[in-house]
């Protein structure tokens, strides 16, 4: 089987950079494509990381322009986010940016799609009164619904609060997640990147699924087998 060609939307983010490096180091994948929004980021990924890069600002690019950027790839990962840069960008990046990439995948005939969402995004009762996060969750919930309604072989990953510690490779079993404690659950960004890789490598276990991700005590391999 030929190595999988993966395009990463939001490659300049913290999870995206970790993911690009993991894909580059894994022989199951071809050189990944970093989709970024500034020329400086293009130069960084091409010259310092040693991967391909496309200057495609999903906020302002058309669906056709995004399609042209990704059409040669087998799978797309959406890890872009507004990153606390204002409510307007939550809707133009986290929501409409995701929807445009989904439409571009459909237009390009790309089936495999992995998106990084947020823990319990579908549960309005959980997040509606969390101060400062309501708009973020509205965007994530709505984007996830568009993904589910697409014809893509999607995986929706819903991580807890993202941490910068070194990855542990250990996750909390889904049947051990306590609903009341969810607001305090966290996961290292490196583990999110690692799970994206594993999702791409194990489509039979992850396609058409929404998966909560928080750090725990179960090895990632066993976690995937339980899905």
Curated annotation (Swiss-Prot):
| Localisation per UniProt entry | Cytoplasm
Matches recorded under InterPro entries: NAD(P)-bd_dom, NAD(P)-bd_dom_sf
Q: Does the keyword Cytoplasm apply?
A: yes
Q: Name one Pfam family in it.
A: NAD_binding_10
This protein's GO CC annotations: cytoplasm
**Keyword annotations of the record:** Cytoplasm
Q: Where on the tree of life does the source sit, at the highest rank?
A: Eukaryota
Task: Using the UniProt record, give the first listed, main subcellular location.
Answer: cytoplasm
Q: What else is known?
A: Present with 704 molecules/cell in log phase SD medium.
Describe the family membership recorded for this protein in Swiss-Prot or TrEMBL: Belongs to the UPF0659 family.
The protein depicted here goes by the name UPF0659 protein YMR090W
